[in-house]
Amino acid sequence: MTIIIGADAHGVELKEVIRQHLTSLGKEIIDLTDTSKDFVDNTLAIVAKVNQKEDNLGIMVDAYGVGPFMVATKVKGMIAAEVSDERSAYMTRAHNNARMITLGSEIVGPGVAKHIVEGFVDGTYDAGRHQIRVDMLNKMC
């Protein structure tokens, strides 16, 4: 698994905390951050890289997390979630097979962000009854 991360200028500090934390856990990270670009371009770069390989995951950080979420969900094949708590991050992997999360640096502090990304990257898709919804989501774009 490779985790593709990025941020705009508003999320770069929290992204760096996340990058260092995941690296300390032995995770393979690719950082696509370009602070000269806004959240739309950074998010699209992450989505493109995540969609290249089935087991890639993505994390995008900006000020509030909502904009990158909206961008990511416009791309065919991407299931993303905007999260601000650990349980939602874990459950979006387990029930929705989300491959990307977005976070807001104005919403989530460093400690919670570390727990969020751990829950997300360590979560596994349960499939079963949840596959019906995932199939529905994948047909939408």
From Swiss-Prot:
Disulfide bonds: none annotated. Pathway: Carbohydrate metabolism; D-galactose 6-phosphate degradation; D-tagatose 6-phosphate from D-galactose 6-phosphate: step 1/1. It catalyses: aldehydo-D-galactose 6-phosphate = keto-D-tagatose 6-phosphate. GO terms for biological process: D-allose catabolic process; galactose catabolic process; lactose catabolic process via tagatose-6-phosphate; pentose-phosphate shunt, non-oxidative branch. SUPFAM superfamilies: Ribose/Galactose isomerase RpiB/AlsB (SSF89623). It comes from the Bacteria. Its EC number is 5.3.1.26. The keyword Acetylation does not apply. PANTHER family: GALACTOSE-6-PHOSPHATE ISOMERASE SUBUNIT LACA, RIBOSE-5-PHOSPHATE ISOMERASE B. This is Galactose-6-phosphate isomerase subunit LacA. It comes from Streptococcus agalactiae serotype V (strain ATCC BAA-611 / 2603 V/R). The gene is lacA.
